[in-house]
Design a protein with these regions (language model features):
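Conserved phosphotransfer microenvironments
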Residues: 50-69
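Hydrophobic/aromatic residues positioned on beta-strands within the core alpha/beta folds
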Residues: 79-81
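C-terminal output helix
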Residues: 104-114
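Acidic, metal-coordinating helix/loop segments flanking the phosphotransfer/catalytic sites
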Residues: 30-48
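Alpha4 helix (beta4-alpha4-beta5 surface) of REC/receiver domains from two-component response regulators
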Residues: 83-101, 108
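Conserved phosphotransfer cores of two-component systems
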Residues: 42-44, 68-74, 94
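A generic structural motif
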Residues: 21-29
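Conserved acidic segment of CheY-like receiver
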Residues: 1-12, 16-20
Length: 115
């Protein structure tokens, strides 16, 4: 499983590992800003896309909108992982599959199904 995260302040891979998620069978990549987000998504072709809302220069919600309007294949799972529940709700309404406070992403069932 390939996981791509756009998050500017928290090391998501370290957070997952620190909370007991086995990433040994996953390919994980994180970008700390959202420059060229569509090209990055296209090149990496993730199964799981994780989006922080408050991230420069393009917010996670706008990354999601741009992805859904593009011809790029939609990842199997899109996770909204803002520290703001309102931002997560906005991304869920737009097309994200899960909305969770970023510090709880290790609790998602996707890690047990794919690891």
């Amino acid at each position: 499983m390939k996981v791509l995260a756009f998050e500017d302040s928290v090391d998501i891979e370290a957070l997952l590992i620190g909370n007991g998620v086995d990433l040994s069978k996953l390919e994980f990549k994180q970008y700390w800003e959202s420059v060229d987000h569509l090209d990055r998504i296209l090149q990496f072709d993730p199964d799981v896309l994780m989006l922080d809302h408050y991230m420069p220069p393009t917010k996670g919600l706008d990354v999601l909108v741009n992805l859904l309007k593009s011809n790029i294949k939609k990842p199997q799972t899109i996770v909204a992982m803002s520290s703001s529940s309102m931002a997560n709700i906005a991304m869920l309404k737009t097309g994200a599959d899960f909305g969770i406070v970023k510090f709880k992403v290790s609790e998602l069932e996707i890690w047990t199904h794919h690891s």
